[in-house]
Amino acid sequence: MGENNIIEGRNAVIEAIKTGRNIENILINKGKTMGSINTVIKLAREKKIVIKEVDKKKLEQLSETGKHQGVIAIVSSYKYCEPDEIIQYAKERDEKPFIVILDEIEDPHNFGAIIRTAEICGVHGIIIPKRRNVSVTSTVYKSSAGAVEHIKIAKVTNINSYIDDIKDKGIWVYGADMEGDEYCYEADFTSAVALVIGSEGKGLSRLTMEKCDVLVKIPMVGKITSLNASVASGIMMYEVLKQKIIGDRR
């Protein structure tokens, strides 16, 4: 099955149905219609989606994650939005743009976890490069617990050019770096914000760091001196959310 053509797992499939994703059909493990699979069946019937009962071997053959939980949805390819749609979406909500820019994130589980946290934290959209970055696959979808359906994701040819573009639109760009200028809790995230998160191994490139308005770091006192991309981005995103909540209350 090609990239982006299946969604695996009960919660992920339920979210796909609820959000109106174009689903061709849903495959369910024959004779295992219990628990939340009944919810999948009920929602699918309401949306008039074809349900097919198949044996476990068929599901195992199609599964890309090995964690299908007895249900796989056959879907159309994921549709990325245009980069400008993210800022427009924030304006429509009368909110200051909150964007996450990912640079060469290669691990699909990390990408999925970042998407999940971003959606929870109110991020308006995620930017990824067209090359050298994992795309939205079934593994990413499942790792995001279906959050992929609730957040905008766009691809750009050049991350640094995109950073220049949004800076011209009044968005402050903060790069995550171990040797940052200040701690993330010292930074002022109350305006329009873009967080730039680098790859698990290399971090941000020198040019990307130079493009950022401020480099921020996370306090670490243990012997291990790095966090994976999903944890680092989660800490940063929650700091932005915290400041926005406090700012709204003032």
Predicted regions and their residues:
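N-terminal positively charged helical leader segments and presequences
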Residues: 1-89
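RNA substrate-binding interface of SAM-dependent RNA methyltransferases
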Residues: 15-21, 88-182
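Active-site/ligand-binding-proximal alpha/beta "capping" segment
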Residues: 174-228
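Structured adenosyl-cofactor binding patch, chiefly the S-adenosyl-L-methionine
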Residues: 14, 141-145, 209-250
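Glycine- and other small-residue-rich loops at beta-strand/loop junctions that grip anionic moieties
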Residues: 5, 29, 103-104, 129, ...
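Surface-exposed amphipathic alpha-helices with a cationic face
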Residues: 45, 163-167, 241
